[in-house]
């Protein structure tokens, strides 16, 4: 089976191919003989009822510094593709949301992965609140009195922006923290939406587990251990990747989430688990494929394409 595939992503020249999951998906698609086109979100347009984009044919190579070749730009009706990979990174802003509205117009006749309507309606730090029984105590708010009441009840907390990503602007706030007032003011000026305040989990020092689900089924995992002098375990922030197995509790979390993800068309999802607590459900542009493979884990890119091909058969 040869599929016509388009990928909407950030500029390919800027990606770090060693850790980039989109690149892993493209390598696998190319190995299977699929025809790949590339475009950035700013090249997507709605002309009357037609969703079009200025795309370029794409060839990829697993060679740092020489990892891609692009063809000449061409304007294409997006309905002509079998599959579109929605893979640009957050911020989950109005530009991102608009692209999901446009791609929703071609789905499911053209299979968009992940389902753009579900991506739009499942922001990582809000969608997870559908599963509070699996989470640490969590508050979504920008009300100072509400936040202080939560801190008084739960002690040390983590405070982070609702639509942040990659570990940016994540802070631990101690029970009697003299910096809280300044931090509150900074967040109030910087972020218009509410923020996430979550009970601090000390076991994060032993790792924040990224678990990948493909079409609702467990596909692989990596434990991300923070640097000694940092709270954040994100690999882009210096976290170290380590091989791992799932605990019974983590398997229970996967079993609970799986059917909900599948029914929403969220085919490729990364969840974050600390000390048996679910903290985030990443649906926009999940990462971890290459780290899992590098540590001897399963070939998740192959699993994803197996599912995509089955849906297109």
Swiss-Prot record:
Domain ATP-grasp: 125-309
SUPFAM superfamilies the UniProt entry points to: Glutathione synthetase ATP-binding domain-like, PreATP-grasp domain
Gene3D superfamilies: 3.40.50.20, ATP-grasp fold, A domain (3.30.1490.20), ATP-grasp fold, B domain (3.30.470.20)
Residues annotated as binding Mg(2+): 280, 282
Keywords attached to this entry: ATP-binding, Glutathione biosynthesis, Ligase, Magnesium, Manganese, Metal-binding, Nucleotide-binding
Cofactor(s) required, per the database record: Mg(2+); Mn(2+)
UniProt KW Electron transport keyword: no
Cofactor binding notes: Binds 1 Mg(2+) or Mn(2+) ion per subunit.
Family as reported in the entry's similarity comment: Belongs to the prokaryotic GSH synthase family.
Protein name per Swiss-Prot or TrEMBL: Glutathione synthetase
Organism: Rhodopseudomonas palustris (strain ATCC BAA-98 / CGA009)
